[in-house]
Each structure stands twice: as C-alpha cells, then as structure tokens.
Amino acid sequence: MQFFKTLAALVSCISFVLAYVAQDVHVSFPSTAGKSRVMIGKVEPRIGIDETVPTTITVEDPNEVIQVNFAIESTNKPFQNTLLIGLPNKNLEMAFEPEIKDNGKLSMYKYRIDLAKLDAALLQEASRSPEPIKATLILASSTAKPKENLFREILQLNLNFDVDHSDSSLVDKFGIKPEIHHIFHAEPKRVAKPIAVIFVLIIFITILSLIVTWLNSCAAAFNNIPTGVTAVYFLGFIATIVGFEVIFARYYLGTSIFETLFSSLYLGAPGLLTSTKFLRSFGQTI
C-alpha cells in the first residue's frame, strides 16, 4: 500500500513539472513614473472551477500602458502564448502576443497593453458594463494534456475614465448578429407579362395578316365555303386556331407550362392533319 502511495505522489510530481507554470507574474506601468508594480505571484493550471480571485487594478489614465511580465522554464516552452484582454461574456476580446527573451534556464515573457490602442468597441462596452475588463492568460500546446495547459484569468481592469461614445455603432458592428433567415420565393405561376404581351401581339398580327390575305385573294367569300368532307377539314382548321388561342390565354391566366405543352401536343397533332388537308384542297379551288 505504501508503494502505491509513493508511486501516485511521484506521478503527481511529474505531471506538475510538465505543466505550464508562470512564475513571478507581476504587472508594471512603464508609462507612469513612480507607480509601483503589482505582484500576482505564481500562476499554475487549475482543474475545475477556479475560485481564486483575480488581481484588480483601477486605471484612471486612458493612455496608460500596462505590462504583464512572468517567467517560464526554457525547457518547457508552450506553443501558444496568448493574453486575452476584453469581455468574454460579450464576445469582445483582443489577443496579445508576448515579447520573449531567454535568460539562462528561464524565458522572460512580456505583454504590453496600450489602453489607447484598444478597440473602441471594447472600451465603449466596458464603460457601459458593470463587469471589469478581464485578462486571461493562455499557455498551451497541442501535445500537452488538458490538465497541463494553463487557461486562467489573472487580472481585472476597472476603467475610471470617460470613454468616447461618439461612434456607438461600433459595439453593434462587432457584436453578435441575429441569425440570417433566407426566404425562398415560390416559383412563378404564370409567364412574365411583357413576354405574354409580345406573343399576343405576334399572334394577333399573324391572324390579322392571314385574314387580310384571304380577303385580297377572294378566298374568304360565301361562294367558296367548303362542302362535304372538306367542310369537316375546314371546321378542324378553325377549331385548331381557336383552340391554340384558348390554350395560350389559359397559360397567361396561370396554367403551368407543362400542362400548356401537353394541351398543345394533344391539339397540335389532329389540328395539323385536318388543317393541312383543308388548305391543300382549298388551295386547288381558289
């Protein structure tokens, strides 16, 4: 039993050694002479809910420069070194990359945060929100275990100065947008009116030209009315013309193109036969 306890303790120590730990974390203010730095201390990974209260700093100068410094063992550098500044609950955060200098067994990390260069949308929302701006440190690698990566809030900034709200559209511009719903319009149930008018004019001019031609050639006269079998072909010819006019009128009023094509096919086959026979026999009697 003692052996297993010792082994478990050894494994825990090894895991702690491999974890990313920020040593001697402190905040300095290089833009303000004489302002003392703020010590945070060692920051290490925490599993589960982190109940540690982050350090709070009140900022009264809108041009303040805040510098976050810490050290990491040179043999255990993380691939991702990011400091997030912003309001996580509002999805307004800016990512800062560090300046890294190797100093023997330790690597010195320095993040420089210039408040004057923070996004206007972030500053405007922070001035309206009761919660402070949060600084979250991320030290992680894809090859490390989740419990070895560091993702912790280390600092809170209370802004004690007036923020310019002249361009209030910035918050809405970078905020969460409502979901886009696209409405697909239904397929048109009738042909476009300009196209229908063009075809009506073409058919009207064609029929009018046909009637004028018949009158000028004396083909349309009472003494030329067909009789016998030719009269049947004549009625079929007239029915074909009237039928196609009705089909086209129904198409313009809302009948689908497929029904129109089927109707034209059903009328066109017998209409072509009777009209051809009528015109052939009628042409011989003119």
From Swiss-Prot:
Annotated GO CC locations: endoplasmic reticulum membrane; oligosaccharyltransferase complex
Cross-referenced InterPro entries: Ribophorin_II_C, Swp1
Topology Lumenal: residue spans: 20-194, 250-252
Keyword terms, alphabetized: Endoplasmic reticulum, Membrane, Signal, Transmembrane, Transmembrane helix
Molecular function terms from GO: structural molecule activity
Signal peptide start-end: 1-19
Main location: endoplasmic reticulum
Any one biological process term the GO annotation gives: protein N-linked glycosylation
Pathway: Protein modification; protein glycosylation
Membrane topology: Multi-pass membrane protein
Membrane spanning residue stretches: 195-215, 229-249, 253-273
Alphabetized Pfam families for the sequence: Ribophorin_II_C (PF25147)
Record topology, Cytoplasmic segments: 216-228, 274-286
Subcellular location per the Swiss-Prot or TrEMBL entry: Endoplasmic reticulum membrane
Remarks, miscellaneous: Present with 8450 molecules/cell in log phase SD medium.
UniProt family annotation: Belongs to the SWP1 family.
Entry-linked PANTHER family: DOLICHYL-DIPHOSPHOOLIGOSACCHARIDE--PROTEIN GLYCOSYLTRANSFERASE SUBUNIT 2, RIBOPHORIN II
Assembly, per entry: Component of the oligosaccharyltransferase (OST) complex, which appears to exist in two assemblies comprising OST1, OST2, OST4, OST5, STT3, SWP1, WPB1, and either OST3 or OST6. OST assembly occurs through the formation of 3 subcomplexes. Subcomplex 1 contains OST1 and OST5, subcomplex 2 contains STT3, OST3, and OST4, and subcomplex 3 contains OST2, WBP1, and SWP1. Interacts with SEC61 and SSS1.
General function of this protein: Subunit of the oligosaccharyl transferase (OST) complex that catalyzes the initial transfer of a defined glycan (Glc(3)Man(9)GlcNAc(2) in eukaryotes) from the lipid carrier dolichol-pyrophosphate to an asparagine residue within an Asn-X-Ser/Thr consensus motif in nascent polypeptide chains, the first step in protein N-glycosylation. N-glycosylation occurs cotranslationally and the complex associates with the Sec61 complex at the channel-forming translocon complex that mediates protein translocation across the endoplasmic reticulum (ER). All subunits are required for a maximal enzyme activity.
Name of the protein in question: Dolichyl-diphosphooligosaccharide--protein glycosyltransferase subunit SWP1
Gene: SWP1
